[in-house]
Each structure stands twice: as structure tokens, then as C-alpha cells.
Amino acid sequence: MKKPLIYVVDDNKITVKLMRRYLEVNGFEVGEAYDGVECLELVDKQKPDAIVLDVMMPRLDGYDTAKRLKSEASTKEIPVVIVTALNDVPNQIKAIDSGADDFLSKPIEEKLLVAKVRLLSNLSFSRKREKKLREVVASLQNGDKTYQWKPVDEILQEEGLI
């Protein structure tokens, strides 16, 4: 099975490097962006399993980036973790209202970051598997013989889902 792909988005290169290290040593593949616009461009090229997104960035902040991701059918299922030093309740609520799936306060605690990213990437993976299985069932119900004699495990393996 391939490593989960996580995008780390922060305008602070040191923070990106730190989170990259935390995630890579724990078995994740990491892509980087330094603002919301770059993040959206990356997502257009390849959908990640989760995004760790800073709030305060130039061009497009984390809240607006999350809103855009969650408003598009092709990206709304990508889990987003908002990360910020603004860790008061109003900002946590703003993160949730923007569509974020979780919230982390700076300074980043490695074990908590890894645990939340692992949880959300597993959720993303499960959603992809469920979607593929629903497609297979619908295909079989419609008389399509593409999957007729293939075991489910083989179908999921072909899709990189096991």
C-alpha cells in the first residue's frame, strides 16, 4: 500500500520543514505549499489524503483556502486540519465554519499532529474504498461484467486501496 500523501501549507518555511520531518518519519509522503493559492494549485495536480493548513498566509489565508476546498465537489472530501497560533475559541469556531475537519494550535506537538493526520488520512482512505465499492456494486447491479469474476480484494488492490 502506498504512503498517504499529506500537503503541509504554511508561509513559514521553518514550520513547513518541521512538520514535513514529523510526518515523513511517521510514514507519510509530504507535499509543500507556502500559501493558499499554491495549495489549490497542488490539489488540482494531485489530490492528497489530507491537508495541514496554516491560517495566516499571504494571498489566500487558511480559512478561505479551506472554504474553497470544501465548496468544490472534487475536493470537499479531503480532510483539512487548520493550524494556528490563534488558539482561542472564536478562531476554533471560525476554523470549523470554514470547513476544517480539525484544529491544531501552535507550537505544533509532533505526536498530536501525527495522530490527527493519521486519523484523517485513514478516514480519507476509507471514503475512497467505500466509493469504489459502491461503484462496483452499482456496476454489477446494472449488468456490467467488468468486475463479475474479480474478488473485491483484487479490485481494491488495482485501485491502490489495499
Residue ranges and their predicted role:
Residues 13-31:
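Two-component/phosphorelay signaling modules centered on CheY-like receiver
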Residues 16, 57-59, 76, 88, ...:
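The feature encodes the CheY-like receiver
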Residues 46-52:
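Active-site beta3 strand of CheY-like receiver
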Residues 57, 69, 80:
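Receiver (REC) domain active-site loop signature in two-component systems and cognate sites
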Residues 108-117:
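C-terminal output helix
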